[in-house]
Each structure stands twice: as structure tokens, then as C-alpha cells.
Curated annotation (Swiss-Prot):
Belongs to the glycosyltransferase 28 family. MurG subfamily. GO terms for cellular component: plasma membrane. InterPro entries: GlcNAc_MurG (IPR006009), Glyco_trans_28_C (IPR007235), GlycoTrans_28_N (IPR004276). It is found in: Cell inner membrane. The gene is murG. Its main location: membrane. Its EC number is 2.4.1.227. This is UDP-N-acetylglucosamine--N-acetylmuramyl-(pentapeptide) pyrophosphoryl-undecaprenol N-acetylglucosamine transferase. It comes from Methylorubrum extorquens (strain CM4 / NCIMB 13688). GO terms for biological process: carbohydrate metabolic process; cell division; cell wall organization; lipid glycosylation; peptidoglycan biosynthetic process; regulation of cell shape. SUPFAM superfamilies: UDP-Glycosyltransferase/glycogen phosphorylase (SSF53756). It comes from the Bacteria.
Amino acid sequence: MTVFTPLVLVCAGGTGGHLFPAQSLAYALKDRGIRVALATDARVDSIAGDFPAEEIVTIASATPSGRSVLRRAGAVVTLGRGFGQAARAVRRLNPAAVVGFGGYPTVPPMLAAQLLRVPTILHEQNAVMGRANGFLAKGARVIATGFKEVRGVPEKATARRVHTGNPIRPAVLAVAETPYPSLDADAPLRLLVFGGSQGARVMSEVVPAAIEKLPQDLRARLHLVQQARPEDLTATQNRYLAMGLGGIEAAPFFKDLPGRMASAHLVVARSGASTVSELAAIGRPAILVPLPGALDQDQAANAATLAQIGAALSIPQSAFTPDRLAAELVDLFEAPRKLTQAAAAAKTARILDAADRLAALVAETAAAT
């Protein structure tokens, strides 16, 4: 006798911020015996190797933004082509439910599912609902949120909102209970700096200049791990080598970033939803520099969730100067109690079972069809 095993189609834009929580959900669904397929865009090739999907469907996608009318029109045409691809995929896969994690690449498959009367679940990772999710919210059966308070949820959709938290990667969960490192006098001070592909440039410009301004006794204790763009790497390393630091490691990418976070006394980073959720999961204090220029200021809202509970400092990029950063580093490193209190505060915001909560919600929705 053939046993029917339901399939869930997970939709996520091909960047880590969308794909990592989608991947965590996929593992949780598979643990429940639910099959998973992934719909995404062409950018996914470099980071989808570990995604537990029995099939990956690449959908044409574009973002209809910018000032150019021709560019926006071209994006709409591309999205239309993606809708046709998505509709064929949804009919062929016949999913019990479709889950979207935001970004314009999710619009064609989510919209196709809604028009074909397949139940859809949205997951909004940020503290401000993105435009793609806002567009899809009206037709979604359930809207799951990564943060308790989320701005921009359409008024008619608020009754369908459920706070699940942001699904956490297994690599982060594996180090989530690592004790905060000792801050004994004269012990190493471990600083981790990263910013993603769009954020590493400002970190490479500001952080070295700030470290130069630290007292020599702090510099001698400082063990620095920093993400730097390939074009900035040599200059950044050479600059640090002349400062007499206790240790320096710079690289364009760290595969073991969760472990690096767990080893750090302090993190300086952007404030994407995954970063903020992982800082809370591991319990590490941070200086956060939200990515400027976003229309909805989602990273500023994300950073505020930790700043408001004393787990982080949020500094706008316009105020993120060497003098300001140096002053904050001295203040924190010379008052270790502030760091330990911030680390404890961060853990009060964590939801380690967010992937399981979301998987239960998806399974319940799929079973109701």
C-alpha cells in the first residue's frame, strides 16, 4: 500500500537572510516526515548545497524598484515570466502548503499558490514587514513573525499573525549554550566584526581607525576577528599588524561564524534579522550598525529590539565614526559587568525552538486542506 506523504513548497530569495531560516524550517519539516521542495531565484546556487529539498525550482525574478521606468517595467515582465514558471511548478508538485520567507523571488510562487487555492503561510523575519510580504499578506492563511512586534502588517491581516520567532540554523543551536567567555583582568578581549557583503566596506574603514585610538593596554589584550572584502583584505591586515594587537584574523568569509560568535566577548555587525536572532540565541552583546538607505528601515527596527532590552548598542552609520566606536569600546571593555549584563539580556529575547514552532504551524495548515 502506498502511503501519501505531504509535500510543502518553501519559497525564499537566494540570499542567506531569507534562505537560512527557510533551511531551518525545512529540516524541522523533514523531522515530521514532511517532504520539502524549494522555490528560489538563480542566486541560490552558491548557498543551497545543504538545503534539504528533494527538488529545487529556480524561478525568474526581479525587484521592481528604482527610478528608471524601463527598469521597473522590465522587472514586472520578469516577474510575469516567473509567475508562469511558478504556476506550472505548483500544479506539478501539488503541495499541501506553500511557505514564503520574503523577497520578490517569493512573489511568483506564493501568488500562483494563492490563485490555485493552495494554502500559503508567510514568515516575516524582520521587525518591519517587507514590501513583498505586505503584497502577499492579504491572501495568506497565516502570517508568522520573527519578532513579537512587527510594523507594517496590513490591518486586515493582524488577526492571522502568529509570533513564532526566527528559525535558527543548526550550527547556531549547537553553540547556543556556550558560556559567556571569562573577562578576568589582563585576559584576552575577543572582538568579532562582520557585516555581510554590503556591510564589510564600512567596517574595514571605521573599525581599524577606531582600534588605533584605543589605549595600548587594551590593544595588547585585543584578539580581533574581522570579515573584510577581498579587495580590502591585505590593507586591513597590514594596518592591524602595525598596532600590536594580541591577535588578528581577517578573511572575506568565515564558515564557522556561529562558533566565532560564541567565542566573542563583543560583536560589531549589521543588524539583519538572522544576525539579531543569532546574537540572542547565543547570548552575545553587540554594537549594531543598521544598513542605511532602506525605505522601511528594517535593520534599524531589528537593532532596536536588542537595544531596548540592554543587549546591544544601535549606532546609525552616519554616527559610526572611529571616535564614537573607540569611545564605546573603551567604555565596554573597561566595565566588564556591562558586557556580561548585555549578554544575559540578549538571551531573554531568544526563541530556540522557532523552527519547530513554525513547522507545527505549517503542518497544521497543510493538514487542514
